[in-house]
């Protein structure tokens, strides 16, 4: 299923604290639901997947949502290719902050539109200014129907305003979890086919389908097949 080389896609998960960014990421990569809220600073995962019949490697960066990590977030955005913007349908305040995260993505990507902008960074992280940044807006916790504060229609309207894709998802029931990430990959793949971005390739890894290859100070989560290096 996997050839001699795998194409790498670097995705970054952004959103307010407590909206379920970690739960979505772990559900995607390890197929496990994390019940407890354990604030993240920066966790990275890799998972080998097949999307539309093509094998690839996803590198997913789960990030902190707190305001004090704004400077770090610039670097995370700079290194990312596609983004999953998450709010909770049961939290109006997390929905209201989405525009702030989206603005930060646009600001950072505009400043890194040429490799010379940041000599210390990889030129592959630079963006083509003519190509839109692939973003998926995700209304998480769709299983919490009785606690809903943000309607599906509001989610669609915001996505149209921001010019990005939208879905509601539930990390708990795994509803639309793959869609949230895979649709970003499909956007990136289309851009690469059109010559708007440069593919990243990496040599074949071991037999592990999923890896957590860097962690924070709070690594005590069930990991399933996860390999820590």
UniProtKB/Swiss-Prot annotation:
Residues 227-229 form a propeptide. GO terms for molecular function: G protein activity; GDP binding; GTP binding; GTPase activity. Residues 209-219 have a biased composition (Basic and acidic residues). GO terms for cellular component: plasma membrane. It is found in: Cell membrane. Residues 111-126 have a biased composition (Low complexity). The keyword Kinase does not apply. It is a lipid-anchor. A lipid is attached at residue 226 (S-farnesyl cysteine). Pfam families: Ras (PF00071). GTP binds at residues 15-22, 62-66, 140-143. Its EC number is 3.6.5.2. Residues 220-229 have a biased composition (Basic residues). InterPro entries: P-loop_NTPase, Small_GTP-bd, Small_GTPase, Small_GTPase_Ras-type. It catalyses: GTP + H2O = GDP + phosphate + H(+). A motif (Effector region) lies at residues 37-45. Keywords: Cell membrane, GTP-binding, Hydrolase, Lipoprotein, Membrane, Methylation, Nucleotide-binding, Prenylation. The modification Cysteine methyl ester is found at residue 226. It is an enzyme of class 3 (hydrolase). One of its GO terms (biological process) is signal transduction. Residues 109-132, 188-229 are annotated as: Disordered. NCBIfam families: small_GTP. Belongs to the small GTPase superfamily. Ras family. Ras proteins bind GDP/GTP and possess intrinsic GTPase activity. This is Protein ras-2. It comes from Neurospora crassa (strain ATCC 24698 / 74-OR23-1A / CBS 708.71 / DSM 1257 / FGSC 987). The lineage of its organism: Eukaryota, Fungi, Dikarya, Ascomycota, Pezizomycotina. The gene is ras-2.
């Amino acid at each position: 299923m996997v050839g001699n080389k795998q194409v790498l896609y670097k995705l970054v998960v952004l959103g307010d604290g407590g909206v379920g960014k970690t739960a979505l990421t772990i559900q995607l990569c390890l197929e496990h639901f994390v019940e407890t809220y354990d604030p993240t600073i920066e966790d990275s995962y890799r998972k080998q997947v097949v999307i539309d019949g093509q094998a690839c490697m996803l590198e997913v960066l789960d990030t902190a949502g707190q305001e004090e990590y704004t400077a770090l977030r610039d670097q995370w955005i700079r290194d990312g290719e596609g983004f999953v913007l998450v709010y909770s349908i049961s939290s109006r305040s997390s929905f209201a902050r989405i525009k702030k995260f989206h603005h930060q993505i646009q600001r950072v990507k505009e400043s890194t539109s040429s490799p010379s902008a940041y000599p210390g960074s990889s030129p592959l992280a630079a963006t083509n200014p003519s190509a839109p940044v692939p973003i998926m807006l995700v209304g998480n916790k769709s299983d919490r129907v009785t606690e809903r504060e943000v309607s599906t229609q509001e989610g669609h309207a915001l996505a149209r305003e921001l010019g990005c894709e939208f879905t509601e998802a539930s990390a708990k029931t795994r509803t639309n979890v793959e869609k949230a990430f895979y649709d970003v990959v499909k956007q990136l793949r289309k851009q690469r086919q059109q010559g708007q971005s440069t593919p990243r390739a990496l040599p074949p890894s071991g037999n592990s389908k999923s890896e957590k290859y860097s962690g924070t100070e709070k690594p005590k989560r069930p990991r399933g097949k996860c390999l820590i290096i």
